[in-house]
Amino acid sequence: EFPYLITPLDAITARAQEDGTTVTSSLSDSDTARAAQIAAAADVAIVFISSDSGEGYLTVEGNAGDRNDLLAWHDGDALVQAVADANENTIVAVNTVGAIITEAWIEHPNVKAVVWSGLPGQEAGNSVADILYGAYNPSGRLPYTIAKSADDYPAQVLYESSAQVPDIDYSEGLLVDYRHFDANGIEPRFEF
């Protein structure tokens, strides 16, 4: 519950009004044909994708609670693909609580940039617009390693268990996150 929220669309639209450019948007994450149509007519296309925690307080795509995979919600991969197929200057903005697998689109030749904003808060719009317009240079540091495949991570989603609360023995010791990748010779998509 924010006292106010500045969305990326609001902030980018305000910047566009200042410099005389035009913003056309689609707020549907499932209408990939419309997104591609808008993108085809634009000089630059910005695609926002997300994945939240769940934590039992919401249900998304039939999943109540924690994420059950490392994919963008609402078929975000298809949305990015459709927009990138239509626009040679596509920027992907990712709002997510943790890593998602980006392999479906990260090597697309029209994806020119990725802005990984994580959970930017009530000033989300201004922070993303500042980066996109070059007012600030993002740090380029991630708080975690992003893999190329969910199988690259040591722990997998436990879909079923006979135990009320599964036992976790943490046998990996200090080999968590980037240490796991280094120790096992796994090349991540984006390093910690």
From Swiss-Prot:
One of its GO terms (biological process) is cellulose catabolic process. Pathway: Glycan metabolism; cellulose degradation. It catalyses: Hydrolysis of terminal, non-reducing beta-D-glucosyl residues with release of beta-D-glucose. Keywords: Carbohydrate metabolism, Cellulose degradation, Glycosidase, Hydrolase, Polysaccharide degradation. GO terms for molecular function: beta-glucosidase activity. Disulfide bonds: none annotated. InterPro entries: Cellulose_deg_GH3, Glyco_hydro_3_C, Glyco_hydro_3_C_sf. This is Beta-glucosidase. The keyword Transmembrane helix does not apply. Belongs to the glycosyl hydrolase 3 family. Its EC number is 3.2.1.21.
